[in-house]
């Protein structure tokens, strides 16, 4: 993991100048309600592109393209780029800015109301590369990870604390960790300071890469049962698994004790201490014989 050196509020002059020119030309402003912080660091941009490992045959979905700094580089490298943007003024500006590129398309829509299948229009492999607005990060991650048409790779900019949860190891894992690791293999690319954006956010961000294999990581595990158990286990984090599962599942402690014994898990442990393999075993045992 790398951390960029702190940047001045102006960031990289060339990208900052481009941002100001575009904002003035189209009478744009960063809308706080939409969590808009525009990327102005060439170094951070390069790290995103390196992690995305784009090829001329790739299809890329970008959520919240902002002023198009990342979009422009995606267009140069990928075969097709589909951006999804809610801000109508940005849609107008980006449509004009990239009108000469036949491999670019922008959809004016709320990403949370638009499925990956609807965006793509066909069943093809794709990558998600995006600087995600903080306020919808978890919802967007769930939407793409749980979709029937999952990306083969996700490279996303998220709040630093969210990134830490996404890549957490056994002992520190939470529900978000399990949600990501159920489908893919996450890794932290780089921590990004607030000065890499305009206007700068109050917290640091981070780039996270999630590789999603074609073959399911949790082969043979019921998705519904897995997340039912996970939500119950993490519903009351300070409680032991015995108490948390009994309360979360609405069953007796005796039933949960029998379940944990069959899975070979100590009832006094807490949810965050379980490894992915232990969650898998717990789920398999539960599916075979529910409490």
UniProtKB/Swiss-Prot annotation:
Specifically dimethylates two adjacent adenosines (A1518 and A1519) in the loop of a conserved hairpin near the 3'-end of 16S rRNA in the 30S particle. May play a critical role in biogenesis of 30S subunits. The keyword Glycoprotein does not apply. It catalyses: adenosine(1518)/adenosine(1519) in 16S rRNA + 4 S-adenosyl-L-methionine = N(6)-dimethyladenosine(1518)/N(6)-dimethyladenosine(1519) in 16S rRNA + 4 S-adenosyl-L-homocysteine + 4 H(+). Keywords: Cytoplasm, Methyltransferase, RNA-binding, rRNA processing, S-adenosyl-L-methionine, Transferase. Belongs to the class I-like SAM-binding methyltransferase superfamily. rRNA adenine N(6)-methyltransferase family. RsmA subfamily. GO terms for cellular component: cytosol. It comes from Dehalococcoides mccartyi (strain ATCC BAA-2266 / KCTC 15142 / 195) (Dehalococcoides ethenogenes (strain 195)). PROSITE patterns: RRNA_A_DIMETH, SAM_RNA_A_N6_MT. This is Ribosomal RNA small subunit methyltransferase A. InterPro entries: KsgA/Erm, rRNA_Ade_diMease-like_C, rRNA_Ade_Mease_Trfase_CS, rRNA_Ade_methylase_Trfase_N, rRNA_adenine_dimethylase, SAM-dependent_MTases_sf. Signal peptide: none annotated. GO terms for molecular function: 16S rRNA (adenine(1518)-N(6)/adenine(1519)-N(6))-dimethyltransferase activity; RNA binding. It holds the Pfam family RrnaAD. S-adenosyl-L-methionine binds at residues 37, 39, 64, 85, 110, 131. Its EC number is 2.1.1.182. CDD domains: AdoMet_MTases. It is found in: Cytoplasm.
């Amino acid at each position: 993991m790398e951390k960029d050196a702190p940047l001045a509020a102006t960031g990289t002059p060339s990208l900052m100048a481009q941002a100001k020119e575009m904002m003035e030309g189209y009478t744009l402003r960063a809308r706080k309600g939409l969590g808009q912080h525009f990327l102005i660091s060439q170094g951070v941009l390069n790290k995103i592109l390196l992690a995305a490992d784009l090829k001329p045959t790739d299809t890329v979905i970008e959520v919240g393209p902002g002023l198009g700094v990342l979009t422009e580089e995606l267009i140069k490298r990928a075969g097709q780029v589909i951006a999804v943007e809610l801000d109508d003024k940005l849609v107008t500006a980006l449509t004009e800015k990239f009108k000469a590129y036949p491999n670019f398309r922008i959809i004016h829509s709320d990403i949370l109301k638009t499925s990956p299948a609807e965006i793509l229009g066909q069943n093809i492999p794709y990558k998600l590369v995006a600087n995600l607005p903080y306020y919808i990060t978890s919802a967007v991650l769930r939407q793409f990870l749980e979709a029937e048409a999952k990306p083969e790779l996700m490279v996303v900019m998220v709040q630093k604390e969210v990134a830490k949860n996404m890549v957490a190891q056994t002992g520190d894992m939470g529900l978000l960790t399990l949600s990501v690791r159920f489908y893919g293999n996450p890794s932290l690319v780089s921590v990004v300071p607030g000065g890499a954006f305009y206007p700068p956010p109050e917290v640091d961000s981070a780039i996270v890469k999630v590789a999603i294999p074609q073959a399911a990581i949790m082969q043979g595990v019921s998705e519904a049962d897995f997340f039912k158990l996970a939500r119950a286990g993490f519903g009351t984090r300070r409680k032991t698994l015995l108490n948390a599962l009994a309360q979360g599942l609405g069953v007796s402690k005796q039933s949960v004790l029998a379940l944990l014994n069959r899975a070979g898990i100590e009832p006094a442990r807490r949810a965050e201490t379980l490894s992915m393999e232990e969650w898998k075993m717990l789920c398999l045992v539960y599916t075979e014989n529910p409490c």
